[in-house]
Amino acid sequence: MWFALNPISTTLKTTLFAWLPPGFAATSSADAAGLLGYPRSALLLTFGAYLILNGLAGPIVEELYFRGYLLPRLSRFGRKAPLLETLLFTVYHFWQPWLYPTILAAFAALVFPIYRTRNIYVGMWAHCLLNLSGGLALTALVLGGAA
């Protein structure tokens, strides 16, 4: 799904959000170049913390809140509850507006099974794997250029 929606996100980022400073949304080697002025030890420490916080802690807390707490409370909206919850989750990622189409599609596909089975653990695993894979790719991109 990411591969299908990546051209849309890239177009949004390079047109509508082109005013963002380099490194704010490091998704390519050109974006990551702004981070290369820092010492390798600082980058290792930063990306180590990033992987723990954004790859594990953040997704678990988000899933506990959005799918564990909020989704059951939105059930009064019936079949619209998963879509409403996904829209709220997408807007919650306000600092990444170029990724809204990707977040909306990826988590819409994830939230319906969670809503049906009332089991958030699959969502936690998927969300952690998604964030860890992106974080590891970003880490490799930046640290590969800092070698």
Where are these predicted regions, by residue range?
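Transmembrane helix-loop-helix hairpins at the membrane interface
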Residues: 7, 35-147
